[in-house]
Swiss-Prot record:
The chain crosses the membrane at residues 12-32, 44-64, 72-92, 193-213, 262-284, 289-306, 321-341. GO terms for biological process: zinc ion transmembrane transport. InterPro entries: ZIP. It comes from Bos taurus. It is a multi-pass membrane protein. One of its GO terms (molecular function) is copper ion transmembrane transporter activity. This is Zinc transporter ZIP11. It is found in: Cell membrane; Nucleus; Cytoplasm; Golgi apparatus. It catalyses: Zn(2+)(in) = Zn(2+)(out); Cu(2+)(in) = Cu(2+)(out). Keywords: Cell membrane, Cytoplasm, Golgi apparatus, Ion transport, Membrane, Nucleus, Transmembrane, Transmembrane helix, Transport, Zinc, Zinc transport. One of its GO terms (cellular component) is Golgi apparatus. The lineage of its organism: Eukaryota, Metazoa, Chordata, Craniata, Vertebrata. Zinc importer that regulates cytosolic zinc concentrations either via zinc influx from the extracellular compartment or efflux from intracellular organelles such as Golgi apparatus. May transport copper ions as well. The transport mechanism remains to be elucidated.
Length: 341
């Protein structure tokens, strides 16, 4: 993130920075035990506030300004922003719904790890999800779909982790799928691993895309500045820090070695540079789509915050701490955007 470089180079540097903070967060597994949820929940709340502020000042505000200054929409200048924002949220939502149908109904990082670790796969078969992943370790952000494919009566593709935790607490662990089924490693294990990697990729596209679009928009309007894009990358990096820990800490508690838990924790941030470069290329080559692209990235980010990060921070009894941490994060990011932008 240096002045004087192309938007694509800036996006690459920015997303390497966000990936690095994901890895730094995952590395806290070497320091914290799996029982220290207050630290994780407070960090997730802070990250949610930071990203809400960054989504507005670094993405939505420039998108609105571009739509208004183009002159082609008149009183309907809100339309491209509303369309892009809705499509961004819908992208993440539809990806969530499609994952079980693609055979990736398990949570991506954990399921991928189990596919590559036969000993833990046997442990999962023998003890069930309740023993391998205790109720206190059930984490939404590890993946939106649970370890168990939990169909709900109202037609939803799956239930949230909170519902899974309640079910496990009230009744015996559900039996694992039979041998030879799609949920077991075997002849189709490489296909399943590829699907799980795809799931991880889709779930982390919004962060990288937001950074790339932010740098690609620099100079297009008064509010789309280098400082604004830099602050956006900083905000996403702050968000990714506890996300890395939210993956590595439960894996460590599940019996993975510290190094393996760290590896899978940082894995989610690895795809962000690719999404960032794509976003920067897209808006540089097709400038008219900028308002849509900025709003799309904002919609995807806000959906992830509301659907994943905030609920996860609330499930372990630390809701008040997480809420006040969110307020603090919003104020800090707002101050950075206004003061340094």
């Amino acid at each position: 993130m240096l002045h004087g470089h192309s938007p694509v180079s800036q996006a690459l540097l920015g997303t390497f920075f966000t990936w690095g903070l994901t890895a730094a967060g995952a590395a806290l597994v070497f320091v914290f035990s799996s029982g220290q949820r207050r630290i994780l929940d407070g960090s997730l709340g802070f990250a949610a506030g930071v990203m809400l502020a960054a989504s507005y000042w670094s993405l939505l505000a420039p998108a609105v300004e571009m739509a208004m200054s183009s002159g082609g929409f008149g009183s309907l200048a809100f339309l491209p922003v509303a369309i892009g924002f809705t499509l961004g949220a819908a992208f993440v939502y539809v990806a969530d719904l499609l994952m079980p149908h693609w055979g990736a109904a398990e949570d991506p990082q954990t399921a991928l790890a189990l596919n590559l670790d036969p000993l833990l796969t046997k442990k999962s078969d023998a003890e069930g999800a309740r023993m391998l992943f205790p109720e206190s370790e059930l984490s939404i952000r590890i993946g939106r779909a649970g370890l168990l494919s939990d169909k709900s009566e109202n037609g939803e593709a799956y239930q949230r982790k909170r519902a899974v935790a309640t079910d496990l607490a009230e009744g015996p662990a559900a039996p694992g799928p039979p041998r030879g089924s799609a949920a077991q490693p075997g002849g189709s294990s490489w296909r399943r691993i590829a699907l799980l990697i795809l799931a991880i990729t889709i779930h982390n596209i919004p962060e990288g895309l937001a950074v790339g679009v932010g740098f690609g928009a620099v100079g297009k309007t008064a509010s789309a500045t280098f400082e604004s894009a830099r602050n956006l990358a900083l905000g996403i990096g702050i968000q990714n820090f506890p996300e890395g820990l939210a993956v590595s800490l439960p894996l460590r508690g599940a019996g993975f070695s510290t190094w393996r838990a760290f590896w899978y924790g940082q894995l989610s941030g690895m795809v962000e540079p690719l999404a960032g470069v794509f976003g920067a290329f897209a808006v540089v080559l097709a400038e008219p789509i900028l308002p849509y692209a900025l709003a799309f990235a904002a919609g995807a980010m806000v959906y992830v915050i509301m659907d994943d990060i905030i609920p996860e921070a609330q499930i372990s009894g630390n809701g008040k701490l997480a809420s006040w941490a969110s307020i603090l994060g919003f104020v800090v990011m707002m101050s950075l955007d206004v003061g340094l932008g």
